Swiss-Prot record:
One of its GO terms (molecular function) is lyase activity. Signal peptide: none annotated. It holds the Pfam family CpeS. Covalently attaches a chromophore to Cys residue(s) of phycobiliproteins. This is Chromophore lyase CpcS/CpeS 4. Belongs to the CpcS/CpeS biliprotein lyase family. It comes from Trichodesmium erythraeum (strain IMS101). The keyword NADP does not apply. The keyword Transmembrane helix does not apply. InterPro entries: Calycin, CpcS/CpeS.
Length: 193
């Protein structure tokens, strides 16, 4: 089956909904040592009338009627199965430029590089690669993300800091199946034998 990449931010959020296992490598272009790690990313799609979406719009003085919807992102340690820590979460709200939805901005209640509310610009290329550009108070960030399959995606981040230090991160992310999905697979396989 041929992959149909998302071409709007809401399609991207919908395709991303669920839990993802993320393996990350960060390369520092100064004297700092490179880093690597594993985590889970939990994504939940939010409708345009969700109170979290409206709150982010109001905090950033944007008319909530312009929002198409949003998503909540939570990060947690790979082996942590408890409730996500709210300090490792963000709400993103989609504000497309036009009806095509291929370009626009999204509002974040908390930035990725600096933990402050921020507005990012995004666009999708013809082959479905999402590029996000963010200007922070002291840094600039760019993220590119694309799906290789419905259950595997890649993210590349670059950060340019005011002190001249640059870093780059590479993430490969695999969709995790839920316990219910696993039980359904086991039942199907048991029925075949």
């Amino acid at each position: 089956m041929k992959l149909k990449p998302p071409m709007t931010m809401m399609d991207f959020f919908l395709k991303s909904e669920g839990t993802w296992f993320s393996q990350r490598t960060v390369h520092h272009f100064d004297s700092a040592q490179d880093e690597s790690g594993k985590s889970n990313i939990l994504v939940k799609v939010l409708t345009k009338d969700d109170p979290k979406v409206i709150k982010v719009c109001e905090q950033q003085k944007v008319n909530p009627a312009l929002a198409k919807g949003g998503a909540s992102f939570n990060w947690q340690d790979n082996l942590d199965h408890g409730e996500p820590n709210p300090n490792y979460s963000a709400i993103l709200v989609d504000i497309p430029d036009s009806q095509t939805g291929r370009t626009g901005k999204f509002l974040r209640n908390r930035g990725y590089i600096e933990s402050i509310p921020v507005v990012s610009r995004y666009h999708f290329t013809n082959d479905g690669v999402l590029t996000i550009d963010t200007e922070y108070e002291k840094n600039q960030g760019q993220e590119r993300c694309w799906f290789l399959t419905d259950d595997f995606r890649v993210r590349i981040n670059t950060v340019r800091m005011m002190n001249g230090v640059n870093l780059m991160a590479y993430c490969s992310e695999r969709r995790c199946i839920t316990r219910k999905q696993l039980e359904e697979i086991v039942q199907k396989n048991a029925a075949r034998s």
